[in-house]
């Protein structure tokens, strides 16, 4: 497979919308929503931290330097954008809690502020979050483009959006996925095992994004082309589909089509199951009750079946399934934006947007879908 970045397809068909977005503490805010309530009892102090101009790992290093706590003793649920104003929860052994208030000024000098202190019986681990609330401010937006943006947001609220991995996965030079493949091929290796694992996951992310874009292409052809043209497309791709099956796919109301053999999952979390009754599963998808899952290839990955598998095969790589430490999984192809509110400030030609996304989903994917500029696999705006 060609590892150069290719343009990723959008879900909706509007023309590009021109505006300026700056990923800065003033115009981009991220607030972590924890997975569970903290009990206020236990051996782990839980602090809510606000930071700006710092990555999560840089923040942890500051805590280690100021408090004397080992980085391995600190717990966090996920990485937050360095340029944004972000809040997230960090756990540390209870014995360090008295030092927090004493070092308030030291934290503030490093662009950190402790917002709250709680306690819990376990350390926060990666993935221990429900999702994130976001605020974004778009600048230099004309009234016409504000109107177009609101129309796009109505579609996104109704149907959801592609769950692309964001640019953070691919690095400043767009080559993390290439380094990950080199590690899998034993052509490169770093002493830091976490870095090796991250780079391999970047390669998985690249394959996932590419598969999702291919599925969007197929969905658009099913929706927009005649039955005859659709059958010809599938024939050219060596994909077998009966005319009656294609008719049924065209009748699905959702823009992203559920295919025979898709792996589905109850939304926003639940068990995996196979898409057998496509009409039924498409209706559940419309109701936001279940979502098709894309492949993150690996040793224990669950593969699709039938037509879905035939499409998926192009984005599988045995080197991932043979790698002992790369277990693999499935990831939502599609996510739903919740609690979305927007406001256009005509005097400032600015558009403000607030919304919630489940964990693992990127605000940059929503930005990509709104802006609709031709970009690459790891679009930057």
From Swiss-Prot:
It catalyses: uridine(13) in tRNA = pseudouridine(13) in tRNA. InterPro entries: PsdUridine_synth_cat_dom_sf, PsdUridine_synth_TruD, PsdUridine_synth_TruD_CS, PsdUridine_synth_TruD_insert, TruD_catalytic, TruD_pseudoU_synthase. GO terms for biological process: tRNA pseudouridine synthesis. The keyword tRNA processing applies. Pfam families: TruD. GO terms for cellular component: cytosol. SUPFAM superfamilies: Pseudouridine synthase. Keywords: Isomerase, tRNA processing. The active site is at 81 (nucleophile). GO terms for molecular function: RNA binding; tRNA pseudouridine(13) synthase activity. The keyword Membrane does not apply. Gene3D superfamilies: TruD, catalytic domain. Residues 160-335 form the TRUD domain. Its EC number is 5.4.99.27. Responsible for synthesis of pseudouridine from uracil-13 in transfer RNAs. Belongs to the pseudouridine synthase TruD family. This is tRNA pseudouridine synthase D. It comes from Helicobacter acinonychis (strain Sheeba).
């Amino acid at each position: 497979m060609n590892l150069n970045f290719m343009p990723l397809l959008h879900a909706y068909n509007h023309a590009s919308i021109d505006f300026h977005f700056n990923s800065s503490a003033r115009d981009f805010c991220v607030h972590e929503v924890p997975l569970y309530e903290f009990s206020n009892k236990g051996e782990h102090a839980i602090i809510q931290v606000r930071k700006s101009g710092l990555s999560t790992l840089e923040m942890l290093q500051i805590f280690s330097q100021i408090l004397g706590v080992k980085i391995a003793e600190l717990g966090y649920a996920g990485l937050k954008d360095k340029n944004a104003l972000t809040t997230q929860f960090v756990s540390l052994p209870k014995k360090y809690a008295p030092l927090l208030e004493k070092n308030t000024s030291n934290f503030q000098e490093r662009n950190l502020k402790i917002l709250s202190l709680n306690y819990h019986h376990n350390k926060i681990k990666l993935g221990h979050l429900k999702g994130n609330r976001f605020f974004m401010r778009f600048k230099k937006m004309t009234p016409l483009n504000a109107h177009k943006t609101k129309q796009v947001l109505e579609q996104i609220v109704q149907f959801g959006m592609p769950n692309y991995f964001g640019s953070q996965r691919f690095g400043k030079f767009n080559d993390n996925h290439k380094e990950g493949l080199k590690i899998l091929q034993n052509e490169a290796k770093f002493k830091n095992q976490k870095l090796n694992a991250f780079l391999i996951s970047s390669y998985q992310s690249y394959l996932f994004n590419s598969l999702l874009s291919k599925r969007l292409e197929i969905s658009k052809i099913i929706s927009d082309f005649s039955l005859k043209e659709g059958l010809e497309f599938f024939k050219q791709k060596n994909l077998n589909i009966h005319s009656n099956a294609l008719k049924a796919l065209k009748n699905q109301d959702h823009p992203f089509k559920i295919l025979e053999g898709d792996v589905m999952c109850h939304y926003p979390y639940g068990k995996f199951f196979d898409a057998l009754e496509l009409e039924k599963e498409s209706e559940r998808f419309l109701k936001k009750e279940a979502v098709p899952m894309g492949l993150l290839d690996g040793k224990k990955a669950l593969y699709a079946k039938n037509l879905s598998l035939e499409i998926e095969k192009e984005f599988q790589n045995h080197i991932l399934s043979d790698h002992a430490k790369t277990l693999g999984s499935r990831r939502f192809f599609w996510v739903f934006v919740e609690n979305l509110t927007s406001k256009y400030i005509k005097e400032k030609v600015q558009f403000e947007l607030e919304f919630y996304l489940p964990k693992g989903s990127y605000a940059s994917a929503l930005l990509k879908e709104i802006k609709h500029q031709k970009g690459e696999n790891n679009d930057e705006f």
